[in-house]
């Protein structure tokens, strides 16, 4: 490709509304342009990267035995009504009617469509298992689109759906998809973790997220420093302390604390170690309980894990924190003065709290705390559960090493769905025993457009994008200095351009009448991995300057060797 026949569209300045680095660089590198809130046009450079991501995804899905299909973006409302998600999905589901007043949706996902297809196409267990995938546009009417294509309203996604007659068969496909996803993100040159994830409202028996590690990520990714253990923060288990509870050394004392309504204020005003404090949170009890609220206790420097807490049998779902009015109606004290002693409702304490002695907590009297509380002496040990977020340095749940926590961007997610959609849409086949059998499903998604942004968040410097070789828009940039004045430079540039293309290498020849500084800046901004610079001074010695974008190293290579050198660098 020649720049004279290409839309480069680079920007010198960073647009003011671009918050994260990927959004900034995608705009500056001429990859995307905003059309409306959460809607982007992909320009040629962006499309080239997008297609490379698509191709890697497609190759590995095919290698894993999945079959490609293509389903409509526009879906009839009756399928969503049949599955029950017409009411459940909420305002992110864009609904409209056609000229015949028939209701439709713009698909945010395709479980209903693929299940409808399968219930009409398959009739026997002999046709299974099957795994179908597509790379298709999705639309979710996000309330606040942000971060460019990281959280846009329209996006490209690879979604796959597998169908089975047994859990064992589903597990085999799930494992194959796990392996395929690992290959996909490894081939793209991304630093990622496959983490255990909560199945949430989708349900099912297993779920993994694939997280690209990046400072700008919205998720906390937890992983061991010595093993393969990894989970998202919601699911990571906080192990109980190994050391036995220390013996009591203090008497329980009622202390006036009128100005200490938070743990931070208590610690500061009374010079307490925060590890010797406990905070008490009240949430609504499950419907039908004999008590309206449940008290949850975590150590003062720990955070309640709301996903874990919601799974407690006595806690209402979704998790709902009690208002001050509701708290006072039950405990007769405000939120800043709560604790386990004389608590009139069920109490659940975290494993770490169970191992504490001589600790401070609210006295369930406004403006007062108890200091020197000890379990089984001052208050009976209540139910113990893992209800906190892990912190860096905690022991790994698999017994190997300690936990680290980094920010991550979710680029893929795999689920064992079970029979949620197949039951709702009555998708079944004749089983081996001749009876009707509801199908078991798995679903597997990759945010294709999000992968592009995530790759940038992990690969950039002060000059621009530093693409992993596998997804760079071009492999080689040829920068001929004063090409339009030097016949020798022009002739060699054309010769190398032809020879490299003949080797199957993607080349961008910068044949613009631009200053060298502009040419260098644009190629570094776009992030092309390999650059060769042709200039009369070096050619006097039969040399060409080569620069590798990732480390910035330059070297002189003989004119006759440059093509073989580049082929070796790119193809190995």
From Swiss-Prot:
Its EC number is 6.1.1.15. CDD domains: ProRS-INS (cd04334), ProRS_anticodon_short (cd00861), ProRS_core_prok (cd00779). InterPro entries: aa-tRNA-synt_IIb, aa-tRNA-synth_II, aa-tRNA-synth_II/BPL/LPL, Anticodon-bd, Anticodon-bd_dom_sf, Pro-tRNA-ligase_IIa, Pro-tRNA-synth_IIa_bac-type, Pro-tRNA-Synthase_IIa_type1. Coiled coil: none annotated. Its main location: cytoplasm. It is found in: Cytoplasm. GO terms for molecular function: aminoacyl-tRNA deacylase activity; ATP binding; proline-tRNA ligase activity. It comes from the Bacteria. It catalyses: tRNA(Pro) + L-proline + ATP = L-prolyl-tRNA(Pro) + AMP + diphosphate. SUPFAM superfamilies: Class II aaRS ABD-related, Class II aaRS and biotin synthetases, YbaK/ProRS associated domain. Pfam families: HGTP_anticodon, tRNA-synt_2b, tRNA_edit. GO terms for cellular component: cytosol. GO terms for biological process: prolyl-tRNA aminoacylation. Keywords: Aminoacyl-tRNA synthetase, ATP-binding, Cytoplasm, Ligase, Nucleotide-binding, Protein biosynthesis. Consists of three domains: the N-terminal catalytic domain, the editing domain and the C-terminal anticodon-binding domain. Catalyzes the attachment of proline to tRNA(Pro) in a two-step reaction: proline is first activated by ATP to form Pro-AMP and then transferred to the acceptor end of tRNA(Pro). As ProRS can inadvertently accommodate and process non-cognate amino acids such as alanine and cysteine, to avoid such errors it has two additional distinct editing activities against alanine. One activity is designated as 'pretransfer' editing and involves the tRNA(Pro)-independent hydrolysis of activated Ala-AMP. Homodimer. Belongs to the class-II aminoacyl-tRNA synthetase family. ProS type 1 subfamily. This is Proline--tRNA ligase. It comes from Escherichia coli O7:K1 (strain IAI39 / ExPEC). The lineage of its organism: Bacteria, Pseudomonadati, Pseudomonadota, Gammaproteobacteria, Enterobacterales.
């Amino acid at each position: 490709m020649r720049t004279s026949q290409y839309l480069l569209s680079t920007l010198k300045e960073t647009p003011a509304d671009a918050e994260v680095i990927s959004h900034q660089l995608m705009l500056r590198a001429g990859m995307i342009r905003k059309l409306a809130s959460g809607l982007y046009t992909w320009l040629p450079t962006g499309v080239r990267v997008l297609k490379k991501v698509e191709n890697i995804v497609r190759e590995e899905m095919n290698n894993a035995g999945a079959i490609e299909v293509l389903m409509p973006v526009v879906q009839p409302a009756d399928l969503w009504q049949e599955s029950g998600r017409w009411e459940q999905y909420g305002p992110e589901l864009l609904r409209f009617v056609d000229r015949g007043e028939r209701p439709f949706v713009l698909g945010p996902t395709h479980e209903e469509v693929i299940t409808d297809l399968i219930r009409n196409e398959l009739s026997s267990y002999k046709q299974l298992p099957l795994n179908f995938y597509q790379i298709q546009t999705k639309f979710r009417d996000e309330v606040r689109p942000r971060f460019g294509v990281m959280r846009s309203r329209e996006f490209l996604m690879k979604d796959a759906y597998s169908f089975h007659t047994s859990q064992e068969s589903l597990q085999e496909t799930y494992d194959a998809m796990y392996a395929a996803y690992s290959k996909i993100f490894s081939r793209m040159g991304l630093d990622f973790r496959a983490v255990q994830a909560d199945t949430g409202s989708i349900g099912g028996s297993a779920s993994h997220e694939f997280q690209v590690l990046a400072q700008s990520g919205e998720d906390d990714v937890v992983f061991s420093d010595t093993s393969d253990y990894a989970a998202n923060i919601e699911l990571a288990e906080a192990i109980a302390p190994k050391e036995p509870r220390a013996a009591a050394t203090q008497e329980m004392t009622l202390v006036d604390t009128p100005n200490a309504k938070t743990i931070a204020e208590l610690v500061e005003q009374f010079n307490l170690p925060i590890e010797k404090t406990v905070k008490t949170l009240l949430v609504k009890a499950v419907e039908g309980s004999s008590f309206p609220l449940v008290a949850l206790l975590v150590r003062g420097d720990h955070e309640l894990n709301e996903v874990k807490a919601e799974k407690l049998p006595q806690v209402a779902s979704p998790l709902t924190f009690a208002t001050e009015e509701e708290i006072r109606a039950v405990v007769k004290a405000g939120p800043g003065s709560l604790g386990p002693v004389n608590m009139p409702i069920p109490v659940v304490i975290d494993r770490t709290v169970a191992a504490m002695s001589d600790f401070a907590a609210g006295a369930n009297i406004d403006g007062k705390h108890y200091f020197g509380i000890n379990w089984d002496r001052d208050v009976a040990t209540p139910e113990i559960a893992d209800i906190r977020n892990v912190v860096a340095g905690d022991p790994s749940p698999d017994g190997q090493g300690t936990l680290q926590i980094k920010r991550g961007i979710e680029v893929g997610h795999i689920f064992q769905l079970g029979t949620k959609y197949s039951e709702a849409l009555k998708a079944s086949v004749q089983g081996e025993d001749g009876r009707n059998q509801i199908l078991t499903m798995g679903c597997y998604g990759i945010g294709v457009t999000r992968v592009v942004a995530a790759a940038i968040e992990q690969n950039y410097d002060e000059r621009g994008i530093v693409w992993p070789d596998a997804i760079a828009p071009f492999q080689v940039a040829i920068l001929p200095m004063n090409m339009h004045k030097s016949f020798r430079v022009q002739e060699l540039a054309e010769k190398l351009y032809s020879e490299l293309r003949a080797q199957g290498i993607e080349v961008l020849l910068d044949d613009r009448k631009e200053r060298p500084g502009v040419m260098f800046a644009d190629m570094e901004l776009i992030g092309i991995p390999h650059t060769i610079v042709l200039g009369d001074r070096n050619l006097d010695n039969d040399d060409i300057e080569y620069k590798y974008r990732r480390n910035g190293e330059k070297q002189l290579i003989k004119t006759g060797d440059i093509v073989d050198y580049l082929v070796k660098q790119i193809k190995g």
